[in-house]
Design a protein with these regions (language model features):
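Short N-terminal signal/transit or membrane-insertion segments
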Residues: 1-34, 104-106, 110, 249-252, ...
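Assembly/oligomerization interface modules of large self-assembling protein complexes
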Residues: 2-91
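The N-terminal extracellular segments of secreted preproproteins, especially immediately downstream
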Residues: 25, 47-48, 57, 80, ...
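Long, contiguous amphipathic alpha-helices that act as assembly "spine/axial" helices in icosahedral shell
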Residues: 83-142
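A generic structural signal for short, non-catalytic loop/turn and secondary-structure boundary residues
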Residues: 84-88, 164-166, 255
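Generic detector of well-ordered alpha-helical segments enriched in charged/polar residues
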Residues: 114, 122, 126, 130, ...
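Extended, solvent-exposed, turn-rich assembly/linker loops in the middle of proteins
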Residues: 138-203
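Sequence/fold signature of self-assembling virion shell proteins
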Residues: 194-285
Length: 285
């Protein structure tokens, strides 16, 4: 059928994946208006210092009788941990719509750009967090012999997290490897919250943006038939309001070519704590 005879209808709406970084109950998503929080944040790490057991060297001496400032190293001395300052940098995502002014109004261009960001912000944020945090800070636990099975990889990652953090963490899984979590019953859905968790209790994020990246520490691309999995402490996402540029029709038009451009952007700050571990797994053995 000739293009001129086709009837124009509304766009096909989509739905972001239910277990992505913004939709899962694993993530604490906070909509903030304070622009200072959107420039980056820092905090004292909590839960990264170990809680140790103390043995009374005398057997019958009260633990409270020693000086809290004693650094002699003698038997019974208690160790102190200085919490580290952690930080998270801003991530700005945008979607731009470009069209001819003939047949497409400013309102239509704006609506299209805003809908594009709403649908794609989760995927975009996952990809950016993967590049800017996971691949930069992770400890690679892949053995010299090569990639592990998915079950072995999850076990190694959860062990890594447990050694440095005593709370619930987050397992980050590319969408392309997610189906293999069901092979060994590695993730289960909480019927009350709809979230996924492992047998250990760690949350699971399945990311389309993770699958688009699928790189290891340092940005190393995954070998064919493999995928990278990561684990972190809990996540807090600070999300600012979306901003539409320009906010009125006139400035959206380029008078040189009569094209219209509308941009929508939003800033996020994604924080996690204590440790990041990575492992390469086989998805096509």
């Amino acid at each position: 059928m000739a293009a001129g005879l086709r009837k124009s209808v509304e766009a096909i709406n989509g739905t972001p994946l239910p277990h992505g970084i913004l939709n899962t109950p694993c993530t604490d998503v906070r909509d903030v208006a304070d622009e200072h929080e959107l420039l980056g944040v820092e905090w004292l790490a909590l839960g990264c210092c170990p809680v140790r057991s103390w043995t009374d060297p005398c057997g019958d001496e009260s633990p409270g009788e020693e000086s809290p400032g004693d650094e002699s190293g003698a038997p019974g001395t208690k160790e102190f941990c200085r919490p580290e300052t952690e930080h998270a940098e801003p991530i700005t995502l945008y979607a731009g719509a470009e069209c001819s002014t003939i047949g497409w109004s400013y309102a239509e261009a704006r609506e299209h750009a805003e809908a594009t960001l709403a649908l794609g912000e989760q995927q975009g944020l996952e990809a950016a967090f993967w590049r800017q945090k996971l691949t930069r800070d992770a400890v690679d636990l892949t053995p010299a012999e090569g990639p592990l099975s998915v079950a072995q990889g999850v076990a190694v990652l959860e062990g890594c997290l447990a050694e440095s953090y005593g709370g619930v963490g987050v397992l980050h899984v590319p969408a392309g490897a997610a189906a293999l979590l069901g092979c060994c019953d590695l993730a289960r859905e909480n019927t009350a919250t709809g979230g996924l968790s492992t047998l250990t209790g760690n949350c699971v994020i399945i990311g389309a943006g993770y699958s688009a990246e699928n790189t290891g520490p340092g940005g190393t691309p995954a070998d064919p038939g493999t995928a990278w999995l990561y684990i972190t402490g809990p996540l807090v996402v600070r999300r600012g309001p979306s901003v539409t540029i320009p906010d009125r029709p006139g400035p959206s038009v380029n008078i040189r070519n009569n094209d219209r451009r509308v941009l929508v952007e939003r800033t996020y700050v994604v924080g996690t704590t204590c440790t990041v571990c990575a492992v390469q797994v086989e998805v096509c053995p």
